[in-house]
Amino acid sequence: MMKRILLTCAALLLSGQALADDCANASTQAEMNTCAVTQYQTADKELNETYQNALKRAAPPQQELLKMAQTAWIAMRDADCALISSGTEGGSAQVMIANQCLADKTAEREAFLASLLQCEEGDMSC
């Protein structure tokens, strides 16, 4: 059983590296679309982890403000990316353009929230 788990983990790690290599060499629109979706999913996962850590460290009044800010930020990010990708609406590149936008803005937000974690516990003003 343990051997099976280790083999599965190794396969997942190798497939992640293979995907990164594939993305560096993506040449078709379908490959580029897949890579952009994967990049966004990775950025979103990192953001969610950082957001949960920020919520845990925030004082109760700040937790509510952070939740409100995050909800507003998601709406703005989605609207911005819809606008940015609207020029390619119906085209094969729309998925890539939209997901690159989502990945970039999500990574920026994750970096911002990570900077809040550098503050002393309960102090989000640094």
List each language-model region with its residue ranges.
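N-terminal alpha-helical modules
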Residues: A18-C126
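Sec-dependent N-terminal signal peptides
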Residues: M2-G16
